[in-house]
Amino acid sequence: LKDTLALRHTITGFYDKDNYIHDVLTQSLLLQAEAAFFQYQNQFGANALMMLSLAENESALGRSYLAYTRNNLFGHAAYDSSRYASTSGSVYSHALHYLSNAYMNPSQFQFHGGFFGNKAGGMNVSYASDPYWGEKAAQYFYEMDHAMGDRDHNRYALGIVKNTGVSIYKNADKKSDA
């Protein structure tokens, strides 16, 4: 999947952006998972900043009840008996099972685009009932990338086409070359 999406990430560490993330994380369980975000980005092709943004959204910046009592940063399978051994385990499960094998895998029914999205496209079609879930997660992503100098913002144009009869254009313009 990593090669399929041709992901190349320019953000390589949490301290790329002054102390913003450090200030947020020192009071949350997200700090314990720092290395896991990058390890599983490289292992499974799931963007670390995207996973962190989603974890911030789903776990109240790593301070939610599920984060503290279950090491669960994403709210997945949050049953009384279900607990991750560590926050890294939560990131592993999210990167492998939810992103790489489902929501970011074009051959799976959950795939509607490799972005947070809304109810028309992206992960939010199947992931969350809140129609604004994608906007909330994307806001965390945008704020962190902006604080790091907008190194990922508008850097890539990715597309996955399963039908060979679809025209692909260089720009979002009627006059663009195919």
Mark where each language-model region is.
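Pyridoxal 5′-phosphate
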Residues: 58
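C-type cytochrome heme c attachment motif
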Residues: 53
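Catalytic cores of secreted/periplasmic lytic hydrolases that degrade extracellular macromolecules
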Residues: 1-50, 61-178
